[in-house]
Structures are given as structure tokens and as C-alpha cells.
Amino acid sequence: MAAFVGLPLRSVPMLLLLLLLVVAGTARGETLYGPEDSVTILNKESVARAVFNSSSAWLLEFYSSWCGHCINYAPTWKALARDVRDWEPAIKIGVLDCAEEDNYGACKDFGVTLYPTFRFFKAFTKEFTQGENYKAVGDREIQTVRQVIIDFLQTSPAESKPQAWPSLEPISSSEISSLLTPKQSHYTAIIFESEESYEGREVILDLIQYSNIVVRRALPSDKPILEKLGIGSVPSCYLIQPNGLHGLINDVKSIRSQLSLHLKALSNVRKLLPSETAHSGLSKGVQQEDTTMNQFDRSKLYMTDLESGLHYILRAELANHHTLEGEKLKTFKDFVTILYKLFPGRPHVMKLLETLQEWLVSMPLDTIPYDAILDLVNNKMRISGIFLTNHTQWVGCRGSKSNLRGYPCSLWKLFHSLTVQAAVKPDALANTAFEAEPRAVLQTMRRYIREFFGCRECAKHFEAMAKETVDSVKTPDQAILWLWRKHNVVNNRLSGAPSEDPKFPKVQWPTSDLCSACHSQTGGVHSWNEDEVLAFLKRYYGNQEISLEFADPRKDLSEAATDNGNKEPHFTKKPQERDYVKKQNPQFLDKLVQKKPEKSLDSEAAESSQSVSFLGIGFSNIDMSLCVILYVTSSLFLMIMFFFFRFRSKRWKVRYNRPFV
């Protein structure tokens, strides 16, 4: 307060307001890319305006800021963007973070299910398209990606090539001869190289934004012209000056790295215009450390971490799949069954899982649109007592920056909890396909990660790890310890990696402050007391130890009364509406329910329990409709049978009472 001494009293509120703004600014979410990088940072609103009907092609990286492989690859992608920033009139490099909740719908509409995903978009694209997948035979290193970019540009149709684009095709010997005779107003550099070489085309694109110079490439197929110009080997560069002088450039050893700089340094060669700012109004701001992180007890498991992870799974990761079929559908059904039977959730979440599981069992379909599942998850049928938080709120899984920890941490905690619940509730999976199967949770986790987990490299690592030893698990307790061991293996592998949170280092867990009895020393060598570890894991992930702190049920009830978690927009596919706007999801389940006029949120929330819960037993509108249909059908059937037998009985009476003559 001493800082305010001597200030006019009316100035203090203004200073406090400025202080709040500064604090709010430091708490902004991080992404892997910032305005200092040479990439265009896109979001749900800007991606359509940038990509479609653009005069340049685009190469986009769809990534997730929590994905370890994306974090590791970010420096390479930044270096690529810097390396080809002069190519912007031909192609631009962009990124879109699919971990941002506002971008869920965008990534779904572009069909992104794995991270990172790379897509090419042609110039002058008018209709909505999901782009062309990056196809690299080898790696994703800078040189490889540059060559794939050139192949994409060179094979683009004529209507996707602006007149300003340079020609990447080789010129003929006659064209070379015509360039040697008259004086020209600009420099002409001819790069002789083999047909499979990319260096000449890279230099052409490097000089695309520079005036007073034209760069072409030629093949060494015409021996006489090579002898005439004194070219003895390739690659070589022949420079024709505006004054008519021409000759080989001999002081350049490497075509791409040095020749581009040499040509840019020629007299009167100037850059036409500075590159457009790639991120004006698009970037999220410079990454800063989140100093407002809640203080939490590391010895506790928080329900909000589990429910936030479940929200992300059902509304983001799985929602990226437009339909579920085959092995994906089977995996999803088994995953929901495991959740319904073992998830240590609160009643309203468990009722949602129960409803979802029963609905899936009752659907004898080989293909299910995920929008139908979303309608149920978002409780479009307004079944009372069903809701799931519609946002992520990390507590024990919160990192020092918003792109660290989060969902992967929550997924580990979720499956640790499920393995413990399977052990302490041995009859929970009775009368299911997993009855008496000690590896039920592990195999379901393995299949889920293989089919749905967004980080493809992480999924490959886990699959390789599970393939080796998971079959050795014979009891539920062994399943608990197997997952604990493998989690520590992953922690050891990722220790010191770019994806590691410096405030939460990857260590062998549980640490001695959480469970001193779990650790022992034999001859100065550390070892685990696995009996104590097992007991600790059962306590830590048991129902009694899950903290409901930060999980306010009243807050969740207010969410259920509004939109039940349905807040993700969808992409409008019409060319004239290429922005992300608020639209209702396809109401697959609502087609069976009579539409009601819109009401205020207060009246809607007040009526929801009355209109849905019939006689207190939780019948939905669909249930009531089916009951009415069954009642009417049964009544009609009974009436038909009544008249049928009555008619027959009359015929019998007439026959028996007929007088004999």
C-alpha cells in the first residue's frame, strides 16, 4: 500500500484496474507458437478466411498443445517457416491448435483425428475442402518438407496457379540462346541441375519476392549449349546481367544456401514488399508463465481432473470422428462399458454413462454417427439428473503453462483409477464380456489409445510397450502394478524432453514424501516395495480418497440448465459462409421427440425435471412416446382379435341352430 501514498484518491481505482489487466494478461493460455515465429496462427474464425480463395497455397499443421510429439516437433516447424518465409506469394505456413476448446469444431470439420496432421490447400480454393494430407515417404525434416512443398506446387492445376507464380519447369536450349543476345532490364540467373534436383527450384522460390531478377532452371541434356557456356558440371549457375555481360558464378559452392544470398545482394535487386505480417490479429500473445495456478494438495486425486478428462474424451477427441464403425465402434462400446461399471464418478455422471451404455447396447447398427452420441452426451433428450461438465478445469493435472500436462495427465489418472476399481470391485464386470478378465481395463486402454488417442507417436510408443508384457498380467492386482510400472517407464523416457513441465518434473512415482514405505535401499541401490506400492495405489485411487474440492455441484447444475455442454460450433460448408458460426448440432436423437417452442433459461431449467421425470422414475420423452405407441398398438390388436372371434362365434351359432329338413 505504500506505493499508493501521495496519490490522489481517485487515481487508486484506475491503478488497481490496470493491475488487474496485467495479471489477466499473464494468465492467458499458451500455444506452441507465438507472434515472433514465421507461422500464421489460425483459429476457428480465421482459418476459413485465410485458406479459402487465397492467392497462395497453404500448408497447415493441425496440432494439439498437450501432444508430446507436437511439442518436440514445434522447433522444426518454426525453422521450416523461417526457411521458406520468402515463398509466401506461392505458399504460406500456418498452424491451428486443436486443443483449444473453441477450435474443437474446426478440427472436427477438417477431419483431424491425429496430431500432428499436415494438410495442403491449393490456391483459389472456393469450395470447402479438408485439404490434401502431407505425404512424405521419409521423414518430416526441413529438407524433406521443402521438397514435398515443391512437388505440391508443381503438380497443382493451372487454375490454382496465379500469374505471379514463377515457373518451376526447366527451360529449353532455344530459350537459353534467346536470352543471351539482347540486353535486358533485369538479371537472369539460369541454374543447370539434374532433373531430380530441387535446389534450383528452391532458389527460384527464394527470389520470388525480389525485383530486377528472374531465376530459371535448365537440364544438362544439351551438350553443345553446356560447352558454349563453359559448364563442366552440375549444379552450376549462369548469370546474365542487364548490360549484356554473362558468365558462370564460380565463387558459390552450395546452390541453395549461398546462391540465394548472392543473387539477393546484386545491385538494384530489391525486395518488392515486406512479407505480410503472418499473424496480425491472429496470435494469442507471447507465451507467459501462468502465475495464477491454484495451490493444490499433490497427495490428493481430484474429481474435477477425472471429469474434465471425460469431457475432453467425449466432446473433443472422439467427436473428431464423424462416424464410428468396425473396430472403432467396438472399442468405443467396450470403453463405455468399462467406464459405466468402474468409473468412480458422481451420480449425475454415472447416470449419463449408464444411459449411454444402454443406448449403445440397444443400437444394432454397424455404423453410428458420432453426432448422435454427442446429442446424448449433451443430454438433448433432457433426461433429469444427467450432465457432464462442459469445460476442462485442471487441478492436480494443471501445468505451469496451459499447454503442459492437462489431458494426458488426466488420461493416466483415469485408467489408474479404473484398474484400482476393477481390483476392489471384483464383481463389477459380472455379466459383461469382461467377466473374470484381469486385463479388461488394460486391453481397453490399449485399444482406445490405438484407435482414438490424438498423439500418434505417443500411441505407437504405448502399443509397443503393451505388446511386450501385457499378456503376463494374470490378476487385477497385477494389472494395477503393470500400469504403474509402465507409467514410470514413460516418465523416465520423457524426463528432460520439451514436453516436460519444469515445475512438475517427470520423476519415479510415488515419491518418498507420498509413500516412504514404497521405497527401500539394498546395498545403496534403490528398489520398490511393491506390496506397499499396491496398497498406496489402492488408497490413492480409491473412492474414499477422491477430492470433490473445486468440483462445485451447483456450478454443474447451472451448466446442465443451459446447454448441457453443447457449445462447440460447426463449420459452414457454403462458400459464402466460410466462417465458424454458432449452429445447432445435427439433432439425430431429437427427431424422435416433438419440438417444443423456445423458452427462457429459467423456465426451461424449472420445467426440465417435471417434463422429463414421469412419476419420479426418470422416463424421457422417447420412453413416453414408445409407451404410448405400444399402448395404442396393443389396444388395436385386442380390438381386432375381439371382433375376429366374435364374428366366428356368430357363424358357429348359425350352423348349429340350422333346422333339418
UniProtKB/Swiss-Prot annotation:
Keywords: Disulfide bond, FAD, Flavoprotein, Glycoprotein, Membrane, Oxidoreductase, Signal, Transmembrane, Transmembrane helix. The chain crosses the membrane at residues 625-645. Residues 30-155 form the Thioredoxin domain. Disulfide bonds join 67-70, 98-107, 397-409, 455-458, 515-518. It is found in: Membrane. GO terms for cellular component: extracellular space; Golgi membrane. Its EC number is 1.8.3.2. Its cofactor is FAD. Its main location: membrane. Residues 1-29 form the signal peptide. Residues 400-509 form the ERV/ALR sulfhydryl oxidase domain. Catalyzes the oxidation of sulfhydryl groups in peptide and protein thiols to disulfides with the reduction of oxygen to hydrogen peroxide. May contribute to disulfide bond formation in a variety of secreted proteins. This is Sulfhydryl oxidase 2. It comes from Xenopus laevis.
